[in-house]
Structure formats: C-alpha cells, structure tokens
A protein has these predicted regions:
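Short alpha-helical interface patches
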Residues: 17-23, 41-44, 50-87, 182-192, ...
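Conserved ATP-driven motor cores of ASCE-family P-loop NTPases powering translocation/secretion/packaging/pilus
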Residues: 391-493
Length: 572
C-alpha cells in the first residue's frame, strides 16, 4: 500500500490502490512511506482487537431462557441396564441394574402416583416377578402376596408373611430377638416411642415422653439381663407394668415391681436397669401414676391376645434376608393404621440387623441384595432421622428402597422441612400421574424451562396503516403444571440424576415373562395359610383306607423292625 500511495490522492483512488494491493499481497517493497503505513495499520489492528475482546459476552444461542429438553429413553436404557445381572423395571423401555457400582447411581427410587395410577400394577408387581433379590414388601390388602406368592415359591424363595390383617395366621415377630446389647435396647425404645407418637402431635413438653422412655428402658433391660429368652417379649413388659402399682397417699408403699428392682439392686448395684428405674421413681406419686397410665395406653395393643401371641416369639429371621433369597411380606390393612408401627419397627430392626451382618460377617456388603418395596409409604410409621440416615448409607451394603407415595403432599406432611432430603437421597424419581396440585407444580419445576422461538404480528389500520413481523426468543416450561395434570394415563415421567427427563409408557404387567405363574396370568391365588401336605392335598381319598389292627404291623422281635409305615393304612 505504501508503494501505491501518492500525496493528494482522492478516496476513490485510495480504494483502487487498496484493491490492487490486496490482489497482489506478496508484491512487497520497502519505500520511504513504509514505516508510516506500518505504524498506522498496526494501530488500526490493535484497536480492532481491543474492541472485539471487550465486546465478547457469555452467549448461549438457543438456550437464552433455559436448556431443558427431553431425553432418549432407549439411549438411557442402553447405559443403565445390566445385561448380565438383575434389573429393576421402571418403565416399559427403561430398566436399571440393581448393582449401583456399575452405573454410579444408587437404586433408591421415589415413585409418585395417585389412586389408580398403577403404582402396584406397573411397578410393584413387575419388580417382585423379577425375583432378583431378597425382598421386604409392604403390601396393603395382601394384593402382591396373593398374586406373586406361588411364583416366588417356585423360584426357591422362602415366603414369610407378617400379617396385621389376619394376625392369627401371621408369622410371629418379637423385637427382643434382634436386641444384642444395652445400646440396642435404647435404640429400640426410642424408635418405639417415635413410631407410636402421632405425627401431628403438638406436645411441647418432652417430660412425659422422656419419663416413659426411662421406664420402658428399665423394664426391657431387666428382661434382657435377668429373664429367660421365652419371657423376653412385650407381653411380659405389660405384666411388669401391671405390677407397678402407685399409692399416692403412701410414699413408703412398695409395689411388686419395686421389690423386683430392689432385689436386683442388692445383687448388682451398678445395673443399668436399676439406674433407669431410679430415674422413673424420682417422680412423685401422682406423676408416677400418670407415667404408668401413659405407657400402658401407648402399648395397649400388646394386651390383645392376638397381638400378644404375634409378638411372643420370632419367625421372621431378619438376619437371613441378606444371605439367601427371602420374600418378607408385611400385610397391613388399608382402613386401620393403629398397628402399623409394628411394621415400622420391623424396618428399623431390619436395617440395623442387615448392617450388622454386612459389616461384621460379609466384609461390608451383603451377598444377596435386599430390596425394600415400601408401598403406601405414608402408612408406615418410621423414625424420620433414622430412616434418612439409613437411606444415605445403605447402597454400600447392597440394600435399596422403593418409596411409593400418592403425592408430594404426603412427604411434606411426614417430613415437614426435611422432605427434600428424602427426595435428594433417591437418584431416580418416577411420576405416574395424579390430581394433586402441588405435585403438578413440583414436577413442572423439576422439568425446567426450554427456549423457544416466537413470532409476533403487528398490524395497524387506517390512512397510515402498517404491518410488521417480529421474531424473538422466549422461555416456557418443558411441561406446564396443567400439562403435567393432563399426562396420558398410560405414560409416566422418569427423572434420573444427571440425565434429561424422559416420557415413556408404564410397564405392561401382562408382557412380563413370568406372568403365567401369577393370578393375573390365570394361576391360582397364593394362600400362605394353607399347610403343606395337608389332608386336602393327599392324592387319595381317606374313605378308601382303613386302619389295621396294631397286632398286624407291630413286630414281635426288635430284629423285625422295618420302615413299613405304609402298612398302617391299606385300600379297602
């Protein structure tokens, strides 16, 4: 450019000279004006660079108002499904392996769905039919047990039923069996108090609960250390409470229970049971009577003969769930919640027992994974802090939970300000549909906002009329609360930590490979009360047989003894 510069050049000539210089960029020569032109163009270049750098902004074209989008369920299934191991069935096209170490997620799943949304049919029953691990199943109305029991027996499961609908036929559960030291007694009593305290209780004075706790700790510690195993149960606790008489007008009166602890103190002055009983005895006569009445009312269910028998011994064998395939069904009535705290105690002691087995016997991880399928979770009385702590740590022990609720309002009522902690401890969230407004709003916010292109048209009429079209970017919810409410009943929304949400069809129970072995597939319903090898199961009619005379089959000499038990009966 310096070679073509001449003093007095007009702008048109200057542009022509610039074009010719650009046409021959390598025709270089050093002239007297070269330093001046080099300086000018260097300054211009520096100005352009400075303006460009200072004008840069953090722009995300197409995501100005949000980047939410739907994920691909088939791509997710390819990553999370365990092709060689057992899986959980979440939707028709998405399965997730129960071994969280492979996909780096826990398998705690929160399932939300209103009445009739298919919580049991599209999630609960299909995952029981998988027969992938040991299971503890909360089963309102015993529906899952009736449908799947026969299949589980065929697959080699031991089916155990804790039945609060029909306690007379239930397997027995004795909480004392799972108490191994004094510390666990304190934990059991704390959980019992929490489980039997109404969730909406507004008592501001903790005195009564603490006094009840001290008395119950004294009684249970006494039984643990002094009573034979057959007397270590809540029926005996109620007997001891009945023996704890208090006379308000006689401070020197000693009840049979007072004498019992007095004799223990003579033998063992440092007994922890005596220490806790002394705390209770510090209460004045009228106060002590109120404490006894309060404890008696709290544990009144154990005075019922059916419940006393139910908790007299133990047949659940919780420690075996992580060692072989066991299906423990906790059948609860859907119209009466008064005894549901027993199920809460089972879950609490189950977690403690499995943790002990994993840590002390199996080097930190159970050989058989355990799935806690908590249908109608709101009806289970579980201590809030204990369960949240377990939910955060159970993955490493091969334990996982499926928490099924009808709406988010239930969680908020149960956990108050901590409900989001429970949601955060579940890496998968499955929404099946419902009618509760707050749930619609929560799901909509969880989906996020997307950026869309909008076009607006403006037209003004008249003598000076005009017409314009305006294109712009705006944001909207991926699904508005109203769109969440209108979700197709055959579809569901699945959230996975770190992944985009997906919409997919709910799992079709009738397409499960094991459906023919269930009641839905035409098989007979399972009846756990029917005894194996009962008279009705014999292949022959008893009326066709007669009992022989004793002389016909008893040997006269010891050498003639043979295994001929079949000769007791013979056809007529």
């Amino acid at each position: 450019m310096a070679c073509r510069w001449q003093p007095g050049m007009k702008i048109t000539a200057l542009l022509d000279a610039l074009n010719s210089a650009l046409a021959e960029p390598f025709a270089l020569a050093w002239v007297s004006d070269s330093p001046r032109f080099l300086l000018v163009f260097t300054v211009i270049y520096a100005v352009v660079v400075i303006v460009t750098v200072t004008d840069q902004k953090n722009t995300r074209p197409g995501a100005e108002h949000g980047s939410a989008a739907w994920g691909d369920v088939f791509r997710l299934n390819k990553f999370y499904m365990d092709k060689r191991g057992p899986n959980l069935l979440l939707t028709q096209h998405f399965h997730i392996g129960i071994d969280g170490y492979k996909h780096k997620h826990n398998t705690n799943i929160l399932i939300v769905g209103g009445s009739g949304a298919g919580k049991t049919r599209t999630y609960g029953v299909p995952n029981v039919l998988e027969c992938a691990c040991s299971m503890v199943i909360t089963d309102p109305k015993a529906e899952i047990l009736r449908k799947t029991g026969n299949l589980l027996k065929q697959k080699g499961y031991e089916v155990i039923v804790f039945d609060l609908i029909n306690p007379a036929a239930s397997f027995c559960y004795n909480p004392f069996v799972y108490v191994h030291d004094d510390r666990e007694v304190l934990t059991l009593i704390e959980n019992l108090i929490q489980n039997t305290t109404p969730s909406h209780s507004k008592s501001s004075d903790p005195f009564w609960e603490k006094s009840e706790t001290a008395l119950l700790q004294a009684l249970m510690l006494y039984l643990l250390h002094e009573a034979p195993p057959e007397e270590q149960n809540f029926s005996m606790v109620m007997e001891m409470i009945a023996a704890a008489e208090v006379h308000e007008d006689d401070d020197n009166y000693q009840s049979p229970l007072d004498i019992l602890f007095e004799r223990l103190e003579m033998r063992e002055p440092d007994s922890i049971a005596c220490k806790q009983y002394r705390i209770f005895k510090q209460a004045a006569g009228k106060t002590a009577k109120s404490i006894l009445v309060s404890v008696g009312v709290r544990l009144a269910a154990f005075n019922l003969p059916s419940i006393a028998k139910l908790t007299m011994t133990d047949e659940l064998h919780l420690q075996e769930l992580g060692e072989r395939k066991v299906a423990l069904f906790c059948c609860i009535p859907d119209s009466d919640k008064s005894l549901n705290y027993l199920v809460g105690m089972i879950y609490t002691q189950l977690i403690q027992t499995l943790y002990r087995q994993a840590d002390r016997v199996h080097k930190g991880r159970l050989p058989v994974p355990v799935h806690c399928l908590m249908d109608e979770y709101a009806n289970i009385s579980l201590p809030k802090d204990t369960f949240l702590s377990a939910l955060a740590t159970m993955r490493s022990r091969a334990i996982f939970c499926s928490i099924i609720v009808q709406n988010m309002a239930q969680l908020k009522a149960m956990y108050k300000d901590d409900w989001e902690s429970l949601v955060g401890l579940c890496d998968e969230f499955l929404y099946l549909g419902g009618t509760e407004k707050e749930t619609h709003k929560y799901v909509s916010e969880l989906l996020g906002k997307e950026t869309i292109s909008t076009t607006s048209y403006n037209q003004s009429k008249g003598r000076s009329g005009s017409y314009s079209i305006n294109h712009q970017q705006s944001g909207r919810d991926l699904m508005t609360p109203d769109e969440v409410r209108l979700l197709d009943n055959s579809k569901c929304i699945l959230f996975i930590r770190g992944e985009r949400p997906v919409v997919d069809y709910k799992y079709n129970l009738l397409k499960h490979p094991n459906i023919r072995c269930t009641e839905d597939g035409g098989a007979a319903p399972y009846d756990y009360t029917a005894a194996d090898n009962a008279l009705d199961d014999l292949p022959c009619a008893p009326e066709n047989y007669e009992l022989l005379d004793m002389d016909d089959f008893l040997p006269t000499e010891p050498a003639e003894i043979k295994p001929t038990i079949q000769r007791i009966r013979r056809p007529k």
